[in-house]
Every structure is written in C-alpha cells, then in structure tokens.
C-alpha cells in the first residue's frame, strides 16, 4: 500500500506558491519537499527583453548578502536595469536633442545678424 503524505507547512492548498515534490528519505519514507518557483530574471522596462549578464534568481536572492555587486549589475550606464539597446537609444536621443538646441541657437543668432544688416 502507498504511504500517505501530508504537507509539512500550514499552507494546505495546491497553489502555485505551495508546490511540492515527493522525495524518498534515506530511511525509506516518502516526504514532501517544497520546490522554489522558477525565476524569470530581470527584464528591461523599455524593450521588455531579458537583461544579459545577470542570473535569473528570485527577487530576494538579489540582496547584498546573497549576491555580490558585480553579479547583480552590468558595467555601463543603467547597468542591470535597462538593456544595452535601450541605453544606446537614450544616449543617441540625448545627443540629438543637444545638437538641435545648438542649431536653434545658431539660427537665432544668424537671424539677428540679418536683421541688423537690413536695418543699417
């Protein structure tokens, strides 16, 4: 006859957060062993892609004591938060905005010079 099993924790419903595995102990008994949820890993909020170079862990395992800083981040601006393509887009956009401001300023100065030349 098969041995009956009971949950070892108080949470008694078969939910996603209460998944278990049947394991045979060295004494020959069957027990429930709780399994951890699979980690999906960090995603870029802009592109939705996975961030390269960071391990897929549960959120609590990214804490200081469990994972060193160089494993938690990537060595660039917004490292470990945004994907490389999103960072590249941001840098290019910022550069183009600055260039546009400079062009606007130069055009304004040229227009002012033309007005002065027309008056005199």
From Swiss-Prot:
A molecular function GO annotation: structural constituent of ribosome
Keyword terms, alphabetized: Ribonucleoprotein, Ribosomal protein
Pfam families tied to this protein: Ribosomal_L34e
This protein's GO CC annotations: cytosolic large ribosomal subunit
GO BP, sorted A to Z: ribosome biogenesis; translation
InterPro entries given in the database record: Ribosomal_eL34, Ribosomal_eL34_C_sf, Ribosomal_eL34_CS
Entry-linked Gene3D superfamilies: 6.20.340.10, 6.20.370.70
Family: Belongs to the eukaryotic ribosomal protein eL34 family.
Name of the protein in its database record: Large ribosomal subunit protein eL34
Organism: Nicotiana tabacum
Originating gene: RPL34
């Amino acid at each position: 006859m098969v041995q009956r099993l009971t949950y070892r924790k108080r949470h008694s419903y078969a939910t996603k957060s209460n998944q278990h595995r049947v394991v045979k102990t060295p004494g020959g008994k069957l027990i429930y062993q709780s399994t951890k949820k699979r980690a999906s890993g960090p995603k870029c909020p802009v592109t939705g892609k996975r961030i390269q170079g960071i391990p897929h862990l549960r959120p609590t395992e990214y804490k200081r004591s469990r994972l060193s800083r160089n494993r938690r981040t990537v060595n660039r601006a917004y490292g470990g938060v945004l994907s490389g393509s999103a960072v590249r887009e941001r840098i290019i956009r910022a550069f183009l905005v600055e260039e546009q401001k400079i062009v606007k300023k130069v055009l304004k100065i040229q227009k002012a010079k033309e007005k002065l030349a027309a008056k005199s």
